[in-house]
From Swiss-Prot:
This is Large ribosomal subunit protein bL12. The gene is rplL. The keyword Ribonucleoprotein applies. Keywords: Ribonucleoprotein, Ribosomal protein. GO terms for molecular function: mRNA binding; structural constituent of ribosome. Forms part of the ribosomal stalk which helps the ribosome interact with GTP-bound translation factors. Is thus essential for accurate translation. SUPFAM superfamilies: ClpS-like (SSF54736), Ribosomal protein L7/12, oligomerisation (N-terminal) domain (SSF48300). It comes from the Bacteria. Belongs to the bacterial ribosomal protein bL12 family.
Length: 137
């Protein structure tokens, strides 16, 4: 059975929104120098040990791989374009009015994460047409 402290942390994690969970994963990856990407092949248990034992060789192949998942980041929204951008954000994300408004006002913030390049470019185009400054990572 998990300790009381672990149970509290687990409950906090359950309460996170999808965007907050994504931010948490990125922060953990940066803080500990690890990757949350699923290991290839059937060596699920051996992969983390190998990565921990030899981090330099494991990091070398990564730049060679072509990026397949992209994040659309809402960088800035001019005050006079806020309503138009808000409508597009709601359409793209399915968020409610309050959540979409919070996202738009908290820029820079990710709108969509881990999506194909074509979809990311379409979303970027829609947001820019509405007046937002957008970046695809």
């Amino acid at each position: 059975m998990a300790s009381e402290r672990v149970q509290k942390i687990l409950e906090e994690l359950k309460a996170l929104s999808l965007l907050e969970a994504s931010e948490l994963v990125k922060a953990i990856e940066e803080a500990f120098g690890v990757s949350a990407a699923a290991p290839a092949g059937g060596m699920v248990m051996a992969a983390p040990v190998a990565a921990a034992a030899a981090p330099a060789p494991a990091a070398a192949p990564e730049p060679v791989e072509e990026q397949t998942a992209f994040d659309v980041i809402l960088e800035a929204v001019p005050a006079d374009k806020k309503i138009a951008v808000l409508k597009v954000v709601r359409e793209l994300t399915g968020l409610g009015l309050k959540d979409a408004k919070d996202l738009v006002e908290a820029a820079p913030k990710p709108v969509k994460e881990g999506i194909p390049k074509e979809e990311a470019n379409e979303i970027k185009k829609k947001l820019e047409e509405a007046g937002a400054t957008v970046k695809v990572k």
